[in-house]
From Swiss-Prot:
It comes from Sulfurisphaera tokodaii (strain DSM 16993 / JCM 10545 / NBRC 100140 / 7) (Sulfolobus tokodaii). This is DNA-directed RNA polymerase subunit Rpo5. Belongs to the archaeal Rpo5/eukaryotic RPB5 RNA polymerase subunit family. GO terms for biological process: transcription by RNA polymerase II; transcription elongation by RNA polymerase I; tRNA transcription by RNA polymerase III. Pfam families: RNA_pol_Rpb5_C. The gene is rpo5. It is an enzyme of class 2 (transferase).
Length: 84
């Protein structure tokens, strides 16, 4: 007989999932100013994405993603959170 409880997996603990963090308003403003763009010009991530949910991102937030790279050490990318 199968148990009705769901298995919960934390995707952030997987070795291939990079570090995700929601930027503060000040940090987001600074990054957008440095890049000379509007938030909507960043690549998007849906608020329903498992990692976005895990870090508590809401539509309008900007997520900083830090990936490890064998060639350049670390690569930082940003995503704009949209509804959905």
């Amino acid at each position: 007989m199968r148990s009705s409880s769901k298995i919960k997996i934390d995707p952030s603990q997987h070795e291939l999932v990079p570090k995700h963090e929601v930027l503060s308003i000040e940090e987001a403003y600074k990054i957008l100013k440095e890049l000379g763009i509007k938030p909507e010009q960043l690549p998007w991530i849906r608020a329903s994405d498992p990692i976005a949910k895990l870090v508590g991102a809401k539509p309008g937030d900007i997520i900083k993603i830090t990936r490890k790279s064998s060639l350049s050490g670390e690569v930082v990318v940003y995503r704009y959170v949209i509804s959905g």
